[in-house]
């Protein structure tokens, strides 16, 4: 139920009629024809570029096409006017009945309004968070977790079959550091002084791990060489860290479908199989890379290595996959992991990475393009840093983690709902300021409060109407005398509701869930604006002396509430019915 799609269908149907009448050549490609909100609302309700994109293939001036199309469109009962602007743009105004009818359609559809089928039949894997299992999640992980989970919810809303996945980085040197750090806490649990050397993890969160190791192993690991305990302690500590991470994610309202282990790729032939596939395609060779400019990456060697010809698929330089000593680079298991996702049959892959992984984007896209023969697109979203503020000062420390602010620090102070919404108030690749004081302010400068307050206002109107004996069930409101909604401010609010299905599809196609938060703020602003105008213009108040008029206005308010709740659901935020 997308009004823009419906009007576009009308436009393309009339273009087809023009072709049949000989006014346009037959067989024109209409895929670039769009119907969108105009840049300036004063110009109309919708605008189409049809004449502009068809002028060249049709061999006609765009204005001539636009004028002929305008005449045809004006004859449709939904169109109030069709006016040609500039060189050939066409601005459309819809009749009030179209907007009024949309309110009923929203109420009849309920939370299905705005849902789409554009992703139907397509499987997408969204990998996000994938934090090293070495400690509590920090505030940077929070933003990635929220963006990834909101994106997954958005894609489900738009029809995709979504798998949420976490890649456990348990195959590298950092889990050995974790084991050594946990062992010192194990010694501490036995009353010995821990030796938290430079390079080990200092946080208090490892104290319970040490105590758990003591409970399981007693003193059997004391005074033993590292080779005797490293493997057992590493696996034990990693599992405890993953349990902590799962609990952190749950506190934020995030639940993964799949946890994949990097360690499981080693010794199983999966890395070898992925690289063999690239080898069979002629994309693996032995060579020496030119020394890089600037900072030297850790996988560069001034000697022959096994290289992936990633430049064949858009990368800037070829990438090492095996070092001269025969060990794998960090990139090799990542190739194998993404090949595993390709072989699981996903139609699309999405990775949510921290901004520090920017140098990984081209090589990873090259690998997936090669391994899938270009069939499976990989979209990588980079998450920029979050700067924390409290009492007007940077907020940096956490006793629990030792060096950084944890997810729990944030959620315990402001709650999961506020945290999630604020993390989506900027595009993922823009830095974000998170002020613990401002996100709890009850002011219109606080987008979380502003949207929730709009929903609370709507619910207050519904409660008062019920107290007056009015039937405010959606079915009853959908049958209200909606032609009473004739004020330009009311029509403008309905027009904003009409944008919701289109906005959902755009956000889903671009993998940008922040668009939902932006839209909710705009919709709430329009609702508040109409509400506040009622203070000076009694005719705009939602509750009137005439119950017929009241029911129509309440129907509009309820329709706004339906969309706000649907949008908050995509963001993973619980709607508030009453501000406290």
From Swiss-Prot:
InterPro entries: aa-tRNA-synth_I_CS, Arg-tRNA-ligase, Arg-tRNA-synth_N, Arg-tRNA-synth_N_sf, ArgRS_core, DALR_anticod-bd, Rossmann-like_a/b/a_fold, tRNAsynth_Ia_anticodon-bd. One of its GO terms (biological process) is arginyl-tRNA aminoacylation. Its EC number is 6.1.1.19. One of its GO terms (molecular function) is arginine-tRNA ligase activity. Disulfide bonds: none annotated. The keyword Protein biosynthesis applies. Keywords: Aminoacyl-tRNA synthetase, ATP-binding, Cytoplasm, Ligase, Nucleotide-binding, Protein biosynthesis. It catalyses: tRNA(Arg) + L-arginine + ATP = L-arginyl-tRNA(Arg) + AMP + diphosphate. The keyword Zinc does not apply. NCBIfam families: argS. Monomer. PANTHER family: ARGININE--TRNA LIGASE, CYTOPLASMIC (PTHR11956:SF5), ARGINYL-TRNA SYNTHETASE (PTHR11956). This is Arginine--tRNA ligase. The lineage of its organism: Bacteria, Pseudomonadati, Pseudomonadota, Alphaproteobacteria, Rhodobacterales.
């Amino acid at each position: 139920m997308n009004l823009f799609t419906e009007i576009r269908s009308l436009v393309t149907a009339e273009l087809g009629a023009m072709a049949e009448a000989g006014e346009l050549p037959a067989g024109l490609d209409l895929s670039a024809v769009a119907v969108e909100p105009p840049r300036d609302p004063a110009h109309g309700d919708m605008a189409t570029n049809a004449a502009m994109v068809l002028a060249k293939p049709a061999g006609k001036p765009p204005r001539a096409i636009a004028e002929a199309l305008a005449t045809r469109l004006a004859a449709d009962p939904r169109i109030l006017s069709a006016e040609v602007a500039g060189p050939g743009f066409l601005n459309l105004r819809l009749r009030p009945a179209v907007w009024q009818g949309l309110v009923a359609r929203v109420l009849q559809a309920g939370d299905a309004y705005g849902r789409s089928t554009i992703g139907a039949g397509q499987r997408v894997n969204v990998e996000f968070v994938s934090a090293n299992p070495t400690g509590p999640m920090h505030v940077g992980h929070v933003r990635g977790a929220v963006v990834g989970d909101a994106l997954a919810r958005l894609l489900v809303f738009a029809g995709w079959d979504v798998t949420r996945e976490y890649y456990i980085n348990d195959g590298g040197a950092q889990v050995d550091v974790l084991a050594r750090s946990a062992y010192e806490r194990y010694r501490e649990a036995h009353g010995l002084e821990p030796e938290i050397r430079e390079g080990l993890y200092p946080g208090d969160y490892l104290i319970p791990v040490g105590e758990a190791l003591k409970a399981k192993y007693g003193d059997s690991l004391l005074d033993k060489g590292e080779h005797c305990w490293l493997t057992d302690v590493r696996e034990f500590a990693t599992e405890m860290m993953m349990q902590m991470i799962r609990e952190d994610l749950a506190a934020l309202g995030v639940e993964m479908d799949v946890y994949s282990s990097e360690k499981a790729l080693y010794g199983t032939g999966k890395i070898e199989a992925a690289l063999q596939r690239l080898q069979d395609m002629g994309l693996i060779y032995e060579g020496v890379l030119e020394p890089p400019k600037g900072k030297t990456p850790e996988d560069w060697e001034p000697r022959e290595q096994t290289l992936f010809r990633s430049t064949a698929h858009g990368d800037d330089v070829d990438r090492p996959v095996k070092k001269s000593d025969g060990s794998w680079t960090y990139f090799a298991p990542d190739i194998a992991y993404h090949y595993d996702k390709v072989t699981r049959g996903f139609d699309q892959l999405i990775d949510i990475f921290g901004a520090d992984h920017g140098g990984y984007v081209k090589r990873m896209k090259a690998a997936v393009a090669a391994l899938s023969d270009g069939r499976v697109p990989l979209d990588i979203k980079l998450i920029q840093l979050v700067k924390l503020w409290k009492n007007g000062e940077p907020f940096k420390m956490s006793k629990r983690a030792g060096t950084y602010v944890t997810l729990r620090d944030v959620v315990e102070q402001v709650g999961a709902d506020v945290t999630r919404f604020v993390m989506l108030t900027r595009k993922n690749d823009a830095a974000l300021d998170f002020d613990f004081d401002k996100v709890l302010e009850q002011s219109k400068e606080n987008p979380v409060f502003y949207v929730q307050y709009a929903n609370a206002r709507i619910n207050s109107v519904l409660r008062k109407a019920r107290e007056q004996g009015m039937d405010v069930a959606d079915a009853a409101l959908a049958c209200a005398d909606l032609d009473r909604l004739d004020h330009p401010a009311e029509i403008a609010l309905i027009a904003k509701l009409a944008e919701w299905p289109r906005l959902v599809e755009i956000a889903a196609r671009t993998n940008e869930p922040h668009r939902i938060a932006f839209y909710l703020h705009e919709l709430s602003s329009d609702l508040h604006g109409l509400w506040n105008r009622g203070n000076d213009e009694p005719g705009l108040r939602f509750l009137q002396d005439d119950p017929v008029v009241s029911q129509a206005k309440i129907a509009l308010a309820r329709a706004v509430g339906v969309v706000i709740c649907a949008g908050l659901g995509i963001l993973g935020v619980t709607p508030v019915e009453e501000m406290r």
